[in-house]
């Protein structure tokens, strides 16, 4: 059996817990680029795709999942801007000012916990998308990347920068 067409049932000697005598449909796994639609799996055997409709739903879901990751990134930036806008000029005093400039906004423990939770959600989501793309299914890769592209287009226009005001000390003319 070639690696490019290996099924989960053919991997019974590899500790996957399935037997080669199983009559149930199996996942077609490939370590090479593939365009499998039927009997493809993403992430786990429980995400087994055995119909065209399930595959279409999965691919559309992957697309919107990638878009949502970029949306989550926007929510993170909006929360950071909200913290800065509501900081009321709170900065550190005393010996800690040596390590943290006075222009730095310092967040409360609760704000930092929320920021950490949002970052962890972003990181987990991006990792899951990476694992889905590592199925080497061309459709999953294509729709994952197109979803990220559309998501960036929709949600990242605020990251380009701000127009120059001419007040900077080191602006080039």
Curated annotation (Swiss-Prot):
Family to which the UniProt record says this protein belongs: Belongs to the copper transporter (Ctr) (TC 1.A.56) family. SLC31A subfamily.
Keywords linked to the UniProt accession: Copper, Copper transport, Ion transport, Membrane, Transmembrane, Transmembrane helix, Transport
GO biological process, one term: copper ion import across plasma membrane
Protein name as it appears in the record: Copper transport protein ctr5
Reported induction: By copper deprivation, and repressed by copper sufficiency.
UniProt topological domain (Extracellular) ranges: 1-54, 157-173
Primary location recorded for the protein, binned into one broad class: membrane
Record GO cellular component, one term: fungal-type vacuole
Pfam families listed in its UniProt record: Ctr
InterPro entries registered for this protein in UniProt: Cop_transporter (IPR007274)
Transmembrane segments: 55-75, 136-156
Side of membrane Cytoplasmic, spans: 76-135
Membrane topology field: Multi-pass membrane protein
Subunit annotation: Interacts with ctr4.
Domain of life: Eukaryota
UniProt function note: Required for high affinity copper (probably reduced Cu I) transport into the cell.
């Amino acid at each position: 059996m070639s690696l490019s067409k290996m099924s989960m049932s053919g991997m019974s000697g590899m500790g996957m817990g399935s037997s080669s005598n199983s009559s149930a449909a199996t996942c077609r796994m490939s370590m090479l680029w593939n365009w499998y639609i039927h009997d493809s799996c993403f992430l786990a055997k429980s995400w087994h795709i055995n119909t065209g409709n399930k595959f279409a739903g999965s691919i559309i879901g992957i697309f919107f999942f990638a878009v949502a990751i970029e949306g989550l990134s926007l929510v993170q930036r909006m929360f950071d801007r909200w913290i800065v806008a509501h900081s009321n000029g709170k900065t550190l005093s005393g010996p800690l000012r040596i390590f943290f400039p006075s222009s730095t906004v310092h967040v409360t423990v609760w704000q930092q916990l929320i920021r950490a939770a949002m970052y962890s959600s972003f990181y987990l989501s991006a990792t899951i998308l990476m694992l889905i793309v590592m199925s080497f299914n061309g459709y999953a890769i294509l729709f994952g990347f197109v979803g990220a592209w559309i998501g960036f287009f929709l949600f990242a226009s605020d990251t380009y920068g701000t127009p120059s005001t001419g007040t900077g000390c080191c602006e080039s003319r």
